[in-house]
Amino acid sequence: MADLFTKEYNTRTRFTRMCIGEALFVLLDQKEYGQIRISDIVKRAGVSRMTFYHYYDTKEEAVQDYFHEIVKEYVWEVERSKGKLGHFHDRSSIMYALSFFDQYADFILKIVHAGLYSIVIDAMNTYLIEKIRPVYHIPDYELYFYGGALLNVFI
């Protein structure tokens, strides 16, 4: 799960991976993260254990992949806006980001409360370094500061 923006999946593969992510999300309503087993996830997702292990080694990788898909969707939306949101520091851009991720607030808060904050902040940092730094030429430390601040305001 190392590469957030360059790994491409076909529609069927993406659907299977999202079923696994959605199953995990639903199970978080029923159990603590630590009590969820791979067998619970595959049963809920309607896939085999072999399919799960084809994509992931751990349930953390499944969470990471699901969250990365959310971030990819955000990137796609921002790129589709063709600059209408303004500079990424602008209020309109910040409000758009908060509004976009608010639709996933339950999932984000569940993974943060499960002790997986690192998955969220790593995805944020990867987005900033790979998508924002090349455009705005902002130093890494400033991007990390901005990302951490935005994420902490959100949660």
Question: Where do the protein language model's features map onto the residues?
Answer:
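Amphipathic alpha-helical segments that line or abut small-molecule/effector binding pockets
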Residues: H87-D106, Y144
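Amphipathic alpha-helical packing segments from all-alpha helical-bundle domains
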Residues: R91-S93, V112-G148
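N-terminal intrinsically disordered/low-complexity leader segments
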Residues: M1-T13
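Alpha-helical structural segments
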Residues: F15-V26, Q30, R44, E61-S81, ...
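Helix-turn-helix
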Residues: L27-E61
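Short helix-to-loop capping/linker segments positioned immediately adjacent to catalytic or ligand/cofactor-binding
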Residues: K84-G86, I108-H113
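Alpha-helix N-cap/helix-initiation sites
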Residues: T13, R17, G34-Q35, P139-G147
